[in-house]
Amino acid sequence: MVIANSVKTSTPKFIISDISLSDFGRKEIKIAETEMPGLMALRDKYQSEKPLKGAKIAGSLHMTIQTAVLIETLVDLGAEVKWASCNIFSTQDHAAAAIADQGISVFAKKGETLDEYWQYTHYILDWGSDFPNMILDDGGDATGLLILGSKAEKDLSVLDNPSNEEEIALFNSIKSKLKNDGEFYSRIKSNIIGVTEETTTGVARLYQLQKQNALPFPAINVNDSVTKSKFDNLYGCRESLVDSIKRATDVMIAGKTALVMGFGDVGKGSAQSLRGLGAIVKVAEIDPICALQAAMEGYSVVRLEDVVEDIDIFVTATGNYQVITHENLVKMKDEAIVCNIGHFDNEIDVASLKNYQWENIKPQVDHITLPSGNKIILLAEGRLVNLGCATGHPSFVMSNSFTNQVLAQIELFNKSEQYAKEVYVLPKHLDEMVARLHLDKIGAKLTKLTKEQADYISVSVEGPYKSEFYRY
């Protein structure tokens, strides 16, 4: 591990695994840039204007090669950045090294402890005598830390009853910070202009806060941009799920019976990926609309408890809690593969397995012996499998998502007075712009409306072409 100290603050300049990996990281970043036309177009468009000059961004998002391209785009557009990963297993160490080598503050390494994770999240918020004024979040941990910490400043008892290992580490990190600075969280929170949120789970947290009138600053829901959710969540998972399962286990997927739990965009992509390699795919759903969609796609829609003993590969994709319980786990067949592609690690009741015999096969692959004598293969300890056991989504699809992130950061930072403490989405014309920026790369050519055709369907020749309520 490499720690470099900053001259301005007690917070280190960066913490990474190995700075010698920076050349390797830089080579992969250069390749990724050729696959990320949206971000590169924004660099060209805004290079001289620097619309993020003065922005001080605290970023909490998987520290991958693709994220490195995002970070350097933000910096090119004028921002100062401090970055941490939003998952203990998702960092690509060579990507972190390449960013650190550019003098950018990054606190990320693959295989962090929970204590390190929350320490690093604190580091991106601690700018010494200065303050961050923007948050770029994935899962809502940076935003949530500020809110919970602010509550603890007034009433420390909110930290009295942690319910799991993650909360123990989180609560301890807040208590430690408050011992040295009793107003840290409220001071930082008061300087935040807004947050842009990347993923479904984090967006759900923001809407909960809005419903409670507890959102401390404006937020842009990047996840529900069409060019994010219908591309990253669907097409990204369609490629990265099977990539991670194959890298982790080397099993033949064809002929296996797989259960995908959740048939939202992530579940749809996951089911397609498994079917594409010849798996017999079943789907579990709570939503009758999604269940009907799954049935119309030819998947058997089942209940977990009815099929648990017959499934070879379990994939959770719900964003919910305790989707696979201890009762389900102990009934699984020998050598069943269990993994999660939702954001957090609580979809599978991993904690209930801690008293059984674990055999680590390789990083993020564990053999667990059940009371029945059967063994299951747990991937990434129930955390995001595609980033724990592989390298996440391909660069091209992440360019869609991250182009939305940059546009959202520019919008909030420059027009903060136009936004109340609510959750917003980017307007349709920006969604369409993001899509346009990616068409040339794949050789797609748009048909152009005539003026008469545009008038006939009551749209502009240049778009937007769909209503805000259109479901793609």
UniProtKB/Swiss-Prot annotation:
Gene Ontology cellular component list: cytosol
Q: Which InterPro entries match?
A: Adenosylhomocyst_ase-like_sf (IPR042172), Adenosylhomocysteinase-like (IPR000043), Ado_hCys_hydrolase_NAD-bd (IPR015878), NAD(P)-bd_dom_sf (IPR036291), S-Ado-L-homoCys_hydrolase_CS (IPR020082)
Question: Principal localization?
Answer: cytoplasm
Co-factor remark: Binds 1 NAD(+) per subunit.
One Pfam family, short name: AdoHcyase
Give, as in the UniProt entry, the pathway in which the protein acts: Amino-acid biosynthesis; L-homocysteine biosynthesis; L-homocysteine from S-adenosyl-L-homocysteine: step 1/1
UniProt subcellular location: Cytoplasm
Question: What are the EC numbers?
Answer: 3.13.2.1
> Could you tell me the keywords of this UniProt record?
Cytoplasm, Hydrolase, NAD, One-carbon metabolism
Task: Show the catalytic activity.
Answer: S-adenosyl-L-homocysteine + H2O = L-homocysteine + adenosine
Molecular function GO labels: adenosylhomocysteinase activity
Cofactor(s) recorded for this entry are:
NAD(+)
Q: Which GO terms describe its biological process?
A: L-homocysteine biosynthetic process; one-carbon metabolic process; S-adenosylmethionine cycle
- Highest taxon of the lineage: Bacteria
- Sites where the protein binds NAD(+): 199-201, 233, 262-267, 285, 320, 341-343, 386
CDD domains linked to this entry: SAHH
Residues annotated to bind substrate = T64, D138, E198, K228, D232
Role of this protein: May play a key role in the regulation of the intracellular concentration of adenosylhomocysteine.
Which family does the record assign? Belongs to the adenosylhomocysteinase family.
NCBIfam families from the entry? Answer: ahcY (TIGR00936), PRK05476.2-3 (NF004005)
Instruction: Kindly provide the name given to this protein in its UniProt entry.
Output: Adenosylhomocysteinase
User: Which species?
Assistant: Prochlorococcus marinus (strain MIT 9301)
Gene encoding the protein: ahcY
